[in-house]
Amino acid sequence: MQTIAIQGRDLCVTYGSRQVLDHVDITLRCGEVAALLGPNGAGKSTLLKLLCGEMSGAGKLDYFGVPASQWPAEKLANHLGILPQQSSLTFPFTAQEVVELGAIPLNLPRKEVERVARHYMLKTDVLHLAASLYPSLSGGEKQRLHLARVLTQLHQAGQQRILMLDEPTSALDLAHQHNTLQLARQLADEEQCAVVVVLHDLNLAAQYSDRLILLHQGKIVCDAAPWQALTAERIEQVYGYQALVAAHPTRDFPMVYPA
């Protein structure tokens, strides 16, 4: 049986009088990719921030069976990494130096830091940018660079790793969208990493995820495999949009089209 990486029970977040997350129960397991889906304002990014400890809220949250409150921040940083949505932060560093920031919790020798950073830069297709200054990079290059940084951070966690991706494909071209999600899929399949990703593209989610978790008005309305989650009726319920759902012509996952 797959190890439970994260378990949240009765999770709630309120902004003023608005209930952003409404008594959410969620379980994420090692070796699987789970996609958080839903319209703008459904609570996807809020749930991700709550799960990673960036935001406080009500309810119970465990990492690998241990209450979140019992994890020292330094230890949790070795096991949980998050790639946030793009920010306006900048660094007066080279691309490789930015990736090496991920090794700060690891206390590795300098040569090993360089080796690990370059290993993940190669995986995310930014190694050729190693000497480039961070401010000179495009939005998509920065996104891939920060993914390499997060993977560097998790390098020593073995099979107790949680990778959280908040709209990781938003600034990427078609090829790098698929490359990024293929890498997430590979980490889950080959290294038993638990991956949770916020996406807007239902077709990408169906192609690369084991589970689709659909949120609507702060509640989980469906948590199921792609074929069970993506029905025309549910898409209209969640998005208010009439769609057709059909099989991919050569692979076993559903595709969503305009009705």
Swiss-Prot record:
Keywords: ATP-binding, Cell inner membrane, Cell membrane, Membrane, Nucleotide-binding, Translocase, Transport. CDD domains: ABC_Iron-Siderophores_B12_Hemin. ATP binds at residues 38-45. InterPro entries: AAA+_ATPase (IPR003593), ABC_transporter-like_ATP-bd (IPR003439), P-loop_NTPase (IPR027417). Its main location: membrane. SUPFAM superfamilies: P-loop containing nucleoside triphosphate hydrolases (SSF52540). Transmembrane segments: none annotated. It is an enzyme of class 7 (translocase). One of its GO terms (cellular component) is plasma membrane. Its EC number is 7.6.2.-. Gene3D superfamilies: P-loop containing nucleotide triphosphate hydrolases (3.40.50.300). It is a peripheral membrane protein. It is found in: Cell inner membrane. GO terms for molecular function: ATP binding; ATP hydrolysis activity. Residues 6-242 form the ABC transporter domain. Part of the ABC transporter complex HmuTUV involved in hemin import. Responsible for energy coupling to the transport system. NCBIfam families: PRK13548.1 (NF010068). Belongs to the ABC transporter superfamily. Heme (hemin) importer (TC 3.A.1.14.5) family. The complex is composed of two ATP-binding proteins (HmuV), two transmembrane proteins (HmuU) and a solute-binding protein (HmuT). This is Hemin import ATP-binding protein HmuV. It comes from Vibrio cholerae serotype O1 (strain ATCC 39315 / El Tor Inaba N16961).
